[in-house]
Amino acid sequence: MTKKLHIKTWGCQMNEYDSSKMADLLDATHGYQLTDVAEEADVLLLNTCSIREKAQEKVFHQLGRWKLLKEKNPDLIIGVGGCVASQEGEHIRQRAHYVDIIFGPQTLHRLPEMINSVRGDRSPVVDISFPEIEKFDRLPEPRAEGPTAFVSIMEGCNKYCTYCVVPYTRGEEVSRPSDDILFEIAQLAAQGVREVNLLGQNVNAWRGENYDGSTGSFADLLRLVAAIDGIDRIRFTTSHPIEFTDDIIEVYRDTPELVSFLHLPVQSGSDRILNLMGRTHTALEYKAIIRKLRAARPDIQISSDFIVGFPGETTEDFEKTMKLIADVNFDMSYSFIFSARPGTPAADMVDDVPEEEKKQRLYILQERINQQAMAWSRRMLGTTQRILVEGTSRKSIMELSGRTENNRVVNFEGTPDMIGKFVDVEITDVYPNSLRGKVVRTEDEMGLRVAETPESVIARTRKENDLGVGYYQP
């Protein structure tokens, strides 16, 4: 009888990536098949996020539901991973003694051994250590699930912003070697992936070892990824302004595979609040980066993160944020009301902005961003946009759907053979959350570069070390 695995994931794209790796790993080692139905599962894993307010209580609320399933099936294994697990550790078992496994983001590769241990002597396992980059060496080869894929290139963050738990839950910055990253992407390209999204908590801080022992920069890595045949689009998430250097901006000037869309969090437009946040840059320095980016890539669109109601934020501070939003003309944002994360310096600050004032500021900010986003969308009306077709439209099974370079969802009539390929679409209608268009050119008519198949890249560049472990050498 097939054993089943259910994973519930909260939080960022890195968590989504980690969950997909957990599924691949446990399929390879134990034959577990994913199920969306928790009641069917032999193993339940909760991959948690500590960014949002009351994250811990949300975890225990979910575990309370799963406790009922364990009472019916004592052999059921329950595991808690992610940032809340890293933060809370053994405390989770003190409140929820029926949890069998607690693991951090850096120890998910040890899940097979943890499950074996629990199956053997029923002893609970807690492992929230930071074994640096070890997990990537233990994960199975990647499996593509459509024409787009996420690839983690680094872990952790050294910035220690006063409101953020990431350095405490995922550790400090550790970069994967460039050959590991390039080999993974080449494998994905061989399976039909056309767009890759490079992931890291502070992705542009990547400083990985090259095959010759030298240290590569993020700009170097972007150009190497762009050179992999089959990869026609590159995105990356999430960046920090302090390390958005001129060499990265130059890649936007000469590398068309890098999309004309960037998510670059700023958090506030007030230098005083940025200083309290520990951001180590000013609003003017942020705008200087955007100005240089638009000189290199005039059509680039920018999204950002904002925190409103940070301790000490005055009306004047908030007005400076709104001015920055207008000056940069952000296309979209992820914006939140400040809520203290336990263990961070900001948790010790006086939270002196009234809750109603926070809500009002958030509403004003989001309304302005929505207006700007709609204006950007209207400018696309009548233009021809290149779409990577991802599959059937959510709006109608008779239509297809894909994304533009600037991350707009476009629905259109097409044929099944277009899925996984590029099409050029003329935009005919604009809606708040999507666009509509008609196909004017298929991929066969585009003359896209196909100089070498991804399979031949792998065959030509695959090397093995003394242990028989494959690696990539340009």
Swiss-Prot record:
Record domain TRAM: where: 378-441
InterPro entries tied to this protein: Elp3/MiaA/NifB-like_rSAM, Methylthiotransferase, Methylthiotransferase_CS, Methylthiotransferase_N, Methylthiotransferase_N_sf, MiaB_methiolase, rSAM, rSAM_horseshoe
UniProt-recorded Gene Ontology molecular function terms: 4 iron, 4 sulfur cluster binding; metal ion binding; N6-isopentenyladenosine methylthiotransferase activity
Signal peptide: none
The protein's Enzyme Commission number: 2.8.4.3
Enzyme class (EC, first level): transferase
GO CC field: cytosol
All residue ranges annotated as the MTTase N-terminal domain in the record: 3-120
Keywords recorded for this protein, A-Z: 4Fe-4S, Cytoplasm, Iron, Iron-sulfur, Metal-binding, S-adenosyl-L-methionine, Transferase, tRNA processing
Domain of life, per lineage: Bacteria
Catalytic activity, reaction form: N(6)-dimethylallyladenosine(37) in tRNA + (sulfur carrier)-SH + AH2 + 2 S-adenosyl-L-methionine = 2-methylsulfanyl-N(6)-dimethylallyladenosine(37) in tRNA + (sulfur carrier)-H + 5'-deoxyadenosine + L-methionine + A + S-adenosyl-L-homocysteine + 2 H(+)
Cross-referenced Gene3D superfamilies: Methylthiotransferase, N-terminal domain, tm_1862 like domain
Assembly and binders: Monomer.
UniProt xrefs under PANTHER family: CDK5 REGULATORY SUBUNIT-ASSOCIATED PROTEIN 1, MITOCHONDRIAL TRNA METHYLTHIOTRANSFERASE CDK5RAP1
Protein name (database record): tRNA-2-methylthio-N(6)-dimethylallyladenosine synthase
